[in-house]
A protein has these predicted regions:
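N-terminal periplasmic/intermembrane-space "pro-region" immediately following the signal or transit peptide
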Residues: 5, 16-90, 340, 344-358, ...
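N-terminal low-complexity, intrinsically disordered patches enriched in charged
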Residues: 18-20, 96, 167, 318
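Hydrophobic helical h-region of N-terminal Sec-dependent signal peptides
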Residues: 8-14
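Outer-membrane beta-barrel pore domains
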Residues: 24-25, 33, 58, 99-102, ...
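Bacterial N-terminal signal peptides that target proteins for export
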Residues: 1-7
Length: 447
């Protein structure tokens, strides 16, 4: 393993172990560091949706500033306004095997450095501000306000994730693999827009619908100006057995997301899980017309086992030197994982039953997870030769990966993935792109 990763991992483990030796467990915590009673499950490590509720009035009256396991908490005396300051950082080490092209692809980088400022104003308006300083590219990832007067119809305005892809909607710090699959190449990330969302029948049905700045597959929007285009986005998700008395079927969900809109201008290329671009349209090809997406999706979690999958179609009208056409790209992915130490698996992340404290025996070793994933992406044959060069651009890519995750504590997570991506060209007889084989190690520190 790369010495840089070993050194950084050892330093974080030592820091974590020292902190644990000085900090009581949750069940032994003193009242001074208890989370306020009305603190949302999503902020205290539960599997609730990404929403923010006000702190209890009783806790707020006893203190207006507190520091506990979920960050720094500022609360007004009436308990109706509060601010939570926390965040996370991810450091990656990526080693590419059998690189025949000679490029220095091996790298060490800070993938994400994201402080989070979120809370509630006057008991009715949630907010979040999340900048990102990772990859030497400072930007604002999220900034929004959400009016929640009606729990079944919350209005959110700002920059946030478009509700389409299941894998993209999962929080970045809860990912099973270091990077998302090929299927997420066809789904937009965070863009400026307005969204109405809510839940029905005691959270059995959840929905989101919104209107966003025109988005590009696999990319983030910016605040500088509105993109040349716009789109309507909608998603519905059903957990039909969430209230069942049988625990094994409660975490089954199925849904579909999609978008319909107009896009013009440049088209982004497609990247492997190692974040190298493997497909590009011709330099003179531009988006010019309707852009639709459809993404059926599902997950199932039972005890330590978890399965997640989705299928994505992105259909885009394009133009190149007076020739117009429609390109319909498709991708799908399936991810499976098991907690070897028996913890509960879930879409909202994993929490170790016992933190890493080797001095207390093997029962205090954190949580260990083994994961497998397969994904593939197909470029429409109509993209060649007018909109992409068949001699250099592949038509098909498939990825298979194996990952091992170690959750030392609720604050520290180590990930090691080995990913293989192979390609097939659009025209038989053309030498395909060289396969990508990459070993990725990541250390995540959250607070």
């Amino acid at each position: 393993m790369n010495p840089r990763f070993v050194i950084l991992a050892a330093a974080l483990v030592a820091l974590c172990a020292t902190g644990l030796a000085q900090t009581p467990t949750t069940s032994e915590s003193s009242p001074a560091i208890q989370t306020p009673a009305a603190m949302p499950a999503a902020l205290s490590g539960g599997n609730a949706p990404d929403s923010i509720e006000p702190a209890s009035t009783q806790a707020s009256q006893s203190r207006s500033i507190s520091f506990h396991r979920d960050g720094l908490w500022f609360s007004a005396q009436d308990g109706q306004t509060h601010l939570q300051v926390h965040g996370y950082a991810q450091a990656d080490d990526r080693m590419f095997a059998a690189n025949t092209h000679g490029e220095p692809l091996d790298t060490f980088l800070f993938r994400r450095i994201r402080p989070l400022f979120e809370g509630t104003l006057f008991n009715n308006v949630d907010f979040r501000f999340m900048p990102d300083f990772g990859q030497n590219n400072p930007q604002i990832q999220e900034a929004f306000l959400e009016l929640k007067t009606l729990p079944f119809a919350k209005l959110r305005v700002g920059k946030f994730k478009e509700p389409i892809g299941l894998e993209v909607l999962r929080q970045d710090r809860d990912l099973t693999f270091v990077e998302r699959s090929l299927a997420s190449d066809l789904v937009p990330l965070r863009y400026i827009g307005a969204q109405l969302s809510g839940s029905l029948l005691s959270n059995i049905i959840t929905y989101e619908g919104g209107y966003f700045d025109g988005s590009v597959d696999g990319s983030n929007g910016v605040f500088t100006q509105w993109a040349p285009g716009n789109e309507a986005v909608a998603r519905g998700f059903l957990q039909p057995l969430a209230k069942s008395h049988v625990n094994a079927v409660r975490q089954f969900g199925v849904g579909v997301g999609g978008s319909e809109g107009h896009q013009s201008g440049s088209i982004a290329g497609l990247k492997t899980v190692g974040q190298t671009t493997f497909f590009k349209y011709s330099s003179t090809t531009v988006a010019d017309g309707q852009h639709n997406r459809l993404a059926p999706q599902a997950y199932y979690y039972a005890g330590p086992f978890g399965l997640m999958g989705e299928y994505v179609v992105s259909s885009q009208e394009v133009l190149n030197k007076g020739i117009s056409g429609r390109v319909r790209n498709e991708a799908w992915e399936a991810t499976g994982s098991v907690l070897l130490t028996g913890e509960k698996n879930g879409y909202s992340g994993v929490h170790a039953r016992n933190a890493f404290e080797p001095g207390r025996g093997f029962d205090h070793f954190g949580a260990l997870e083994l994961a497998l994933r397969y994904s593939q992406l197909r470029i429409d044959g109509d993209a060649f030769p007018h909109f992409a060069n068949p001699a250099t651009a592949p038509r098909f890519a498939e990825e298979d990966g194996i990952g091992f995750n170690w959750y030392l504590t609720r604050y520290v997570k180590l990930q090691t993935d080995y990913e293989h991506t192979g390609f097939r060209m659009a025209v038989p007889g053309i030498t395909p792109l060289h396969s990508e084989n990459v070993l990725m190690n990541q250390i995540q520190l959250s607070f």
